[in-house]
């Protein structure tokens, strides 16, 4: 019997993708060497956050430019972008398991999502559906909760890169060209006047 292919799930707005995302992916592939592939899943509307700024087409194009700099296998899936209304992780995971029955999944989330994971729809069911949840640090060391519920969580040793899509968009809104965006992505943003007033 063939072993299932271990695959990471990394969702987010990616509006725009930036060097923080790069550091996270590099740390993940380094610390989880048996993971064969990552599915990048941009969301149309996060139920705990606001609306997106860029069109689905622009986000997919930025992500294609972003992943072109990686040698590892990263696949971009648009199933949440095409989903009307908010996207829920449990529904996405269950859909992926139906579409890819030969794969076993792990989930990749940020420390902010770790802190409010109990607010996610059917969060306990999510832990039943994936082998492990990897948490990347954004601002500081995080002390894991001493709870059976959170025994499946593992923290990555990713570099703390002070970059967020929200802050980068704000820089563009203020007519400042930010750093921490890969050159190909930045060129696309400027050429298409994304995030311009």
Curated annotation (Swiss-Prot):
<dbReference type="InterPro" id="IPR014729">
    <property type="entry name" value="Rossmann-like_a/b/a_fold"/>
</dbReference>
<comment type="function">
    <text>Catalyzes the reversible adenylation of nicotinate mononucleotide (NaMN) to nicotinic acid adenine dinucleotide (NaAD).</text>
</comment>
<dbReference type="InterPro" id="IPR004821">
    <property type="entry name" value="Cyt_trans-like"/>
</dbReference>
<keyword id="KW-0067">ATP-binding</keyword>
<keyword id="KW-0662">Pyridine nucleotide biosynthesis</keyword>
<dbReference type="GO" id="GO:0005524">
    <property type="term" value="F:ATP binding"/>
</dbReference>
<protein>
    <recommendedName>
        <fullName>Probable nicotinate-nucleotide adenylyltransferase</fullName>
        <ecNumber>2.7.7.18</ecNumber>
    </recommendedName>
</protein>
<dbReference type="Pfam" id="PF01467">
    <property type="entry name" value="CTP_transf_like"/>
</dbReference>
<comment type="pathway">
    <text>Cofactor biosynthesis; NAD(+) biosynthesis; deamido-NAD(+) from nicotinate D-ribonucleotide: step 1/1.</text>
</comment>
<comment type="similarity">
    <text>Belongs to the NadD family.</text>
</comment>
<keyword id="KW-0520">NAD</keyword>
<dbReference type="GO" id="GO:0004515">
    <property type="term" value="F:nicotinate-nucleotide adenylyltransferase activity"/>
</dbReference>
<keyword id="KW-0547">Nucleotide-binding</keyword>
<keyword id="KW-0808">Transferase</keyword>
<dbReference type="GO" id="GO:0009435">
    <property type="term" value="P:NAD biosynthetic process"/>
</dbReference>
<dbReference type="InterPro" id="IPR005248">
    <property type="entry name" value="NadD/NMNAT"/>
</dbReference>
<keyword id="KW-0548">Nucleotidyltransferase</keyword>
